[in-house]
Amino acid sequence: DFTPVCTTELGRLAPEFAKRVVFIFGPDKKLKLSILYPATTGRNFDEILR
């Protein structure tokens, strides 16, 4: 939700509980990895893919 329209309408927008989510799908279009972590943690996609 890049523009917080859905999260605001559903009442799910709480900045103090902000999280980041990463989903990685394989060539077969199946979910291979799902990570949920605090927004205070930085993103390093090279490290995730490793």
Curated annotation (Swiss-Prot):
GO MF annotations in UniProt: 1-acylglycerophosphocholine O-acyltransferase activity; peroxidase activity; phospholipase A2 activity
Cellular compartments per GO CC: cytoplasm; lysosome
Region forming the signal peptide: none
PTM: Irreversibly inactivated by overoxidation of Cys-6 to sulfinic acid (Cys-SO(2)H) and sulfonic acid (Cys-SO(3)H) forms upon oxidative stress.
Catalytic machinery residues: C6 (cysteine sulfenic acid (-soh) intermediate), D28 (for phospholipase activity)
EC number, as in UniProt: 1.11.1.27, 3.1.1.4, 2.3.1.23
Modification N6-acetyllysine occurs at: K19
UniProt KW keywords: Acetylation, Antioxidant, Cytoplasm, Hydrolase, Lipid degradation, Lipid metabolism, Lysosome, Multifunctional enzyme, Oxidoreductase, Peroxidase, Phosphoprotein, Redox-active center, Transferase
Phosphothreonine: residues bearing it: T3
Assembly mode: Homodimer. Interacts with GSTP1; mediates PRDX6 glutathionylation and regeneration. Interacts with APEX1. Interacts with STH. May interact with FAM168B. May interact with HTR2A.
Note from the entry: The active site is a conserved redox-active cysteine residue, the peroxidatic cysteine (C(P)), which makes the nucleophilic attack on the peroxide substrate. The peroxide oxidizes the C(P)-SH to cysteine sulfenic acid (C(P)-SOH), which then reacts with another cysteine residue, the resolving cysteine (C(R)), to form a disulfide bridge. The disulfide is subsequently reduced by an appropriate electron donor to complete the catalytic cycle. In this 1-Cys peroxiredoxin, no C(R) is present and C(P) instead forms a disulfide with a cysteine from another protein or with a small thiol molecule.
Family membership noted in the UniProt record: Belongs to the peroxiredoxin family. Prx6 subfamily.
Name listed for the protein in its UniProt record: Peroxiredoxin-6
Classification lineage: Eukaryota, Metazoa, Chordata, Craniata, Vertebrata
Gene: PRDX6
